[in-house]
Amino acid sequence: MRVAVLGVGMMGQDHARRLATLTKGAQLVAVSDVDAARTDAVAAELGVRAVHDPAAAIADPEVDAVVIATPGFTHEGLVLEAIAAGKPTLCEKPLTTSPETARAVVEAERALGRPLVQVGFMRRFDAEYEQLRALVASRELGRPLFLHCVHRNATTPPNFNSEMLILDSVVHEVDIARFLLGEEITAITVLTPGRTAHAPEGLQDPQFVLMETASGTLVDVEIFVNTTFGYEVRTELVAERGSAMTGLGVGLVQHSAAGWGGRIAADFKQRFGAAYDTEFQRWVDAVRSGAGVDGPGVWDGYAAAAVCAAGVQSLRTGRRVEVDLGARS
């Protein structure tokens, strides 16, 4: 399967190298970026073609599938072009930057009549989250009552603003809550505690997010992106007959078999590197088998966009905001 990677910033370069050296059944044939010099450098490093127009890469008959790792505001146009061209696509999150444009992508794929677009919510491919989902589905611990989530980064890049804590960071918890619980989020509230002294001027960090699901399970998220000490992602399930936690560095821990420990990861690539590898291999396998998608699809991208848009509204107003996804196509 011949693949082009569109966007070769940090994530795109990582994906291009993965496809070139690790993913079985895939052949990286081209890279594209608005930065021509960077495109040429990555293409030379990996021995592939440099294409300076992403639309040309999508239309290229020598390209079977595309990975979109460009800035989020470009995703809608590129994904719609890929759908029109019938090219299987792995699109980094977000699917698009608004619920309205994400819904348009859902409708475009529906009109095509087959799944073509997978969204890059890589946590679904993490072994610990897969174990936790299986535990929830088994009902061994009874009905889920709470999900307690922690999402911490050491620092933020320049120009990172308060809304981006929701749109770029909490979006992962939105998707993983839907994945683990198997239901939609119906309301969200964003609270703002005191600011850390390490946050840049004007950035509200940390934030506390409370989400409600259709069945009444509560999902809370501590999002703290300027901790200075490392990268931590943890999720604790509290159910009727027990609890279980991921993210302690030793696999899934149940309190009935206590004992845990481990090092704090330096960044998300260290914590979720294996999940990215699995994500790409399963995507390539799905495309080659004709399934098209093996993971989160366009509806998942739309649902995440809708919940995050409601979260931004709550951040601005300080109020609880309901989420209405409408009918699923």
UniProtKB/Swiss-Prot annotation:
Q: Which InterPro entries match?
A: Gfo-Idh-MocA_inositol_DH, Gfo/Idh/MocA-like_OxRdtase_N, GFO_IDH_MocA-like_dom, MI/DCI_dehydrogenase, NAD(P)-bd_dom_sf
Q: State the protein's purpose.
A: Involved in the oxidation of myo-inositol (MI) to 2-keto-myo-inositol (2KMI or 2-inosose).
Which SUPFAM superfamilies does the UniProt entry name for this protein? Answer: Glyceraldehyde-3-phosphate dehydrogenase-like, C-terminal domain (SSF55347), NAD(P)-binding Rossmann-fold domains (SSF51735)
The source organism is Kineococcus radiotolerans (strain ATCC BAA-149 / DSM 14245 / SRS30216)
Family, according to the entry, reads as follows: Belongs to the Gfo/Idh/MocA family.
Matching entries from Pfam families are given as: GFO_IDH_MocA, GFO_IDH_MocA_C3
- E.C. code: 1.1.1.18
Any one Gene Ontology MF annotation carried by this entry is: inositol 2-dehydrogenase (NAD+) activity
Under catalytic activity, the entry for this protein gives:
myo-inositol + NAD(+) = scyllo-inosose + NADH + H(+)
Enumerate the Gene Ontology biological process terms: inositol catabolic process
Record protein name field = Inositol 2-dehydrogenase
Q: How does it assemble?
A: Homotetramer.
Please verify whether the record's keywords include Oxidoreductase.
yes
PANTHER family linked: INOSITOL 2-DEHYDROGENASE (PTHR43593:SF1), PTHR43593
Q: Which keywords does this chain's UniProt record carry?
A: NAD, Oxidoreductase
